[in-house]
């Protein structure tokens, strides 16, 4: 294709005819394209070029010197000479300015280029086409569209090169609307006809928006001006159509091409892949091979990416074998793509082999492996690979640090996370929002939420992921109030996505914030965000955990149902001890042809356990493999709980001894809890011994043992367990309960003395305590005659915060209205008896969801049966 004098290639001399580009000039061995054939006459070879003597002050001589310096690429000396010429008021010729501007562009010297620009403007009222084009090309190359636009306005005359450069500059930086406006202005105001360089720029703009209607309009112009057979223009048209999703039109153009180059094939093949038509793209690739067209790097990386999207391991291996025959297997970008393909397909061992055989590894290679390990749930290997990378003296970038931080978050590896935080600060990677977001996630999962908050507040431009990370982190650290406050703050500047709202709904479910959950539901219905994703299940879970089963059923019936939807309902009824309903739901689920998973059977077994449906529970356990589910340790723990709650402790112990796998602390914990229920100290101590051999850091097992001893009156043993906890540095979360009144959630701590209605709350509770004493029921108050150790045990492991929440609800709601309370710890026996008494006395329904059960109190009875 012949190059036009008005083309946007920077190495041509715009504004002059092609005859000026002589054959001798083109063949000259000069590295600088701005040498216009003027020989380096009168060039001074002395070092004192910054000062001009009076004898050398002629304009012609000075301009010749300056032009010669530009021709030799000596920018620093050229700038010194320019400054001296300005001091002596020696005029600079326009062609010398052009040479100097092109040198600044080639050297990427933005500061010097701006200075030359200022000098030129101060000495000229307007810019000629050649100098204006030089400034345009320079500023566009620097990404400075503001000054480029100003230069464009100062030009006394413009040619096609001027328009092409500016349109291309706007398109390259993503200002597609502005680029299209310039194109139309060029046609209708500038009176300039587009050429083979104009159309690719404009078509790139249409594909970038994307705007198919404008793209078709430009296609009409291509035909009108006679460029429909130009291969570069047609390639640009194909790319535009596939970017706009019109693959059919792109293929029509492709099939009509009289001649195709590798760019044509790549545009069509990658276009199929970008539009999710991987099989069609692969068919075209095989057709290309059949025509003996050799692929290039772009072809192969695109095809490998398609195999990755398809998850087809066999096809991926075939493509890998073909790549080896092409000789591109040693190319690092191809190796990186193959590694990514294997990792995404779950074939991490094959990725390891390929990675180990790579002769040279760049930062992308290491980051791909680290991210791939994390993707395949191998965070240990991800961190080990990072250590290897460090030993190989490869400096991580922001993507690497983010990937390793994600692995640290999965493992709860705070030490490595802090190390990476320091590295990010030192390497100035902390300014990348992806690093900050992953630091928030890491600190949140390592229970350092205050550190996560510090990082969040220091992010100058928070994106949706930043807000989502901190909201999820606050929820994870049981600071649900703050999570919901952050959601409201986020809505002032950004729209939450489905993941954000899912985290917020989990916070609502945790503290029983029904009204806030309903607000989120209304937002979802109004905006439609996440309706086809996992958000409906999050809404269902929120209603179930807030105790609104009728609303939960309405949500369940209105949404697309998957195994997670059924599991949420099963868990909800299981927590309420409604085993018959759990069994009925399971049967309906199977009849609906939804395949149960391991979580389904956990809920099913727990439901049978709490309803003492031993026979049915054992039957379902024996049939698990019929549904393709292999029992794991959680299921074995459920069976132990099933037998233990029913009083069959010896059978439960024998079941543990016959397990085909080694029991974990959860299995022994289920037996310990059964011993607590039935006051069996010997077997309980045996269970605790096995637990503490395996796990000395889980506070819940210490609480179970304490409760076993306390229920049997062994207060010295309670004190011993308390000392063990202290020696191991274990603490119990403070008791906290939440109650929603008039759409607002109120929190109550066990030792809360600062609530504005504390006096009224205490008065109400004391009234109930007096009535309980009158009928011979025990109570917990400061005047209790109970052993101090027992009082301490109840205060620590329960806190009685639900009593304050219930009293607050009674004070601030009308008689007869149900009260819903959520608690972070388990209810103690005394609180359970107290709430039963209150429900009977005030004739109200009171629901309390604690850490283990859902208690529904009515007329002095509880749904749990205790």
UniProtKB/Swiss-Prot annotation:
Residues 774-866 are annotated as: Type DYW motif. It comes from the Eukaryota. GO terms for cellular component: chloroplast. Residues 743-773 are annotated as: Type E(+) motif. It is found in: Plastid, Chloroplast. Disruption phenotype: Albino cotyledons without primary leaf and seedling lethality under autotrophic growth conditions. GO terms for molecular function: RNA binding; zinc ion binding. Keywords: Chloroplast, Plastid, Repeat, Transit peptide. One of its GO terms (biological process) is chloroplast organization. Residues 1-52 form a transit peptide. InterPro entries: DYW_dom (IPR032867), E_motif (IPR046848), Pentatricopeptide_rpt (IPR002885), PPR_At4g14850-like_plant (IPR046960), TPR-like_helical_dom_sf (IPR011990). Its main location: plastid. Transmembrane segments: none annotated. Residues 667-742 are annotated as: Type E motif. The keyword Plastid applies. Gene3D superfamilies: Tetratricopeptide repeat domain (1.25.40.10). PPR repeats lie at residues 58-92, 93-123, 128-158, 159-194, 195-229, 230-260, 261-295, 296-330, 331-365, 366-396, 397-431, 432-466, 467-493, 497-531, 532-561, 562-596, 597-631, 632-662. NCBIfam families: PPR (TIGR00756). Belongs to the PPR family. PCMP-H subfamily. Regulates the RNA editing of the chloroplast transcript accD, and is essential for the early stages of chloroplast biogenesis. Required for the RNA editing of the chloroplast transcript ndhF. This is Pentatricopeptide repeat-containing protein At1g15510, chloroplastic.
């Amino acid at each position: 294709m012949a190059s036009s004098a008005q083309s946007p290639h920077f190495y041509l001399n715009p504004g002059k005819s092609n005859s000026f580009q002589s054959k001798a000039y083109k063949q000259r061995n000069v590295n600088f394209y701005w040498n216009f054939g003027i020989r380096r006459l009168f060039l001074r070879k002395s070092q004192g070029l910054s000062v001009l003597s009076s004898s050398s002050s002629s304009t012609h001589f000075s301009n010749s010197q300056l032009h010669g310096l530009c021709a030799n690429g000596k920018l620093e000396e050229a700038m010194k000479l320019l400054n001296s010429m300005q001091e002596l008021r020696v005029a600079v010729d326009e062609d010398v300015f052009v040479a100097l501007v092109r040198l600044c562009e080639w050297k990427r010297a933005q500061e010097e280029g701006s200075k030359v620009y200022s000098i030129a403007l101060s000495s000229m009222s307007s810019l000629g086409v050649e100098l204006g084009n030089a400034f345009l090309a320079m500023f566009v190359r620097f990404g400075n569209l503001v000054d480029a636009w100003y230069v464009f306005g100062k030009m006394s005359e413009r040619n096609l090169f001027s328009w092409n450069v500016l349109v291309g500059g706007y398109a390259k930086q993503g200002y597609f609307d502005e680029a299209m406006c310039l194109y139309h202005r060029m046609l209708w105001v500038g009176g300039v006809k587009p050429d083979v360089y104009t159309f690719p720029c404009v078509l790139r703009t249409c594909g970038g928006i994307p705007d198919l209607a404008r793209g078709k309009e430009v296609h009409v112009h291509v035909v009108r001006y006679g460029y429909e057979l130009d291969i570069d223009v047609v390639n640009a048209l194909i790319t535009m159509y596939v970017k706009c999703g019109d693959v059919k039109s792109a293929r029509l153009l492709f099939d009509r091409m009289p001649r195709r180059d590798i760019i044509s094939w790549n545009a069509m093949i990658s276009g199929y892949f970008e539009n999710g038509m991987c099989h069609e793209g692969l068919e075209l690739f095989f057709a290309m091979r059949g025509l003996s067209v050799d692929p290039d790097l772009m072809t192969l990386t695109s095809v490998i990416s398609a195999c990755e999207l398809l998850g087809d391991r066999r096809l991926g291996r075939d493509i890998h074998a073909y790549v080896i025959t092409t000789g591109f297997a040693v190319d690092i970008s191809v190796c990186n793509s193959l590694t990514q393909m294997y990792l995404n397909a779950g074939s991490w061992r094959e990725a390891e082999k390929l990675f180990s055989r790579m002769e040279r590894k760049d930062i992308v290679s290491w980051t791909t492996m680290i991210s791939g390990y994390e993707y395949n749930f191998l965070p240990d290997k991800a961190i080990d690979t990072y250590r290897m990378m460090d030993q190989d003296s490869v400096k991580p970038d922001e993507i690497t640090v983010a990937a390793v931080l994600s692995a640290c978050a999965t493992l709860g590896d705070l030490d490595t996370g802090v190390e990476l935080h320091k590295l990010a600060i030192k390497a100035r990677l902390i300014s990348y929002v992806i690093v900050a977001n992953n630091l928030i996630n890491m600190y949140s999962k390592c229970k350092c939420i205050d550190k996560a908050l510090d990082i969040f507040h220091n992010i100058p431009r928070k994106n949706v992921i930043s807000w989502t990370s901190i909201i999820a982190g606050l929820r994870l650290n049981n600071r649900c109030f703050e999570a919901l406050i952050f959601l409201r703050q986020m809505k002032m500047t950004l729209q939450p996505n489905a993941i954000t709202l899912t985290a917020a709904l989990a916070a609502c479910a945790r503290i029983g914030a029904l009204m806030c959950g309903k607000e989120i539901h209304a937002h979802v219905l109004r905006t439609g965000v996440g309706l086809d994703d996992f958000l409906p299940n999050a809404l269902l879970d929120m209603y179930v955990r807030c105790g609104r089963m009728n609303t939960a059923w309405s949500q369940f019936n209105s949404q697309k149902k998957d195994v997670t939807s059924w599991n949420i309902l099963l868990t909800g009824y299981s927590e309420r001890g409604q085993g018959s309903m759990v069994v009925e739901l399971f049967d309906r689920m199977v009849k609906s042809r939804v395949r149960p998973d391991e979580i389904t059977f956990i809920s099913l077994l727990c439901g049978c356990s709490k309803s003492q449906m031993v026979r049915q529970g054992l039957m379902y356990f024996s049939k698990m493999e019929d549904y393709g589910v292999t029992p794991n340790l959680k299921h074995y723990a459920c069976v132990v709980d099933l037998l233990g709650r029913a009083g069959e402790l010896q059978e439960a112990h024998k079941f543990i001894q016959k397990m085909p796998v080694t029991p974990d602390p959860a299995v022994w914990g289920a037996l310990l809890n059964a011993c607590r229920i039935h006051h069996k100290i010997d077997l309980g101590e045996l269970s605790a011994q096995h637990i503490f051999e395996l796990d000395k850091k889980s506070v819940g097992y210490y609480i179970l043992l304490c409760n076993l001893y306390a229920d049997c009156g062994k207060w010295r043993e309670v004190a011993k367990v308390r000392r063990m906890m202290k020696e191991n540095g274990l603490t119990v979360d403070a008791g906290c309960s939440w109650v929603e009144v008039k759409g607002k959630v109120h929190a109550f701590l066990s030792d809360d003395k600062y609530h504005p209605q504390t006096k009224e709350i205490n008065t109400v509770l004391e009234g109930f305590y007096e009535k309980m004493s009158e009928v011979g029921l025990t109570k917990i108050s400061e005047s209790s005659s109970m052993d101090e150790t027992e009082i301490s045990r109840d205060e620590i492991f329960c806190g009685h915060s639900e009593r304050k929440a219930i009293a607050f609800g009674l004070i601030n709601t009308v008689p007869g209205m149900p009260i819903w309370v959520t608690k972070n710890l388990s209810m103690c026996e005394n609180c359970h008896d107290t709430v039963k008494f209150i429900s009977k006395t005030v004739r109200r329904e009171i629901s309390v969801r604690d850490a283990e059960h859902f208690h529904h109190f009515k007329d002095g009875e509880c749904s749990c049966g205790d």
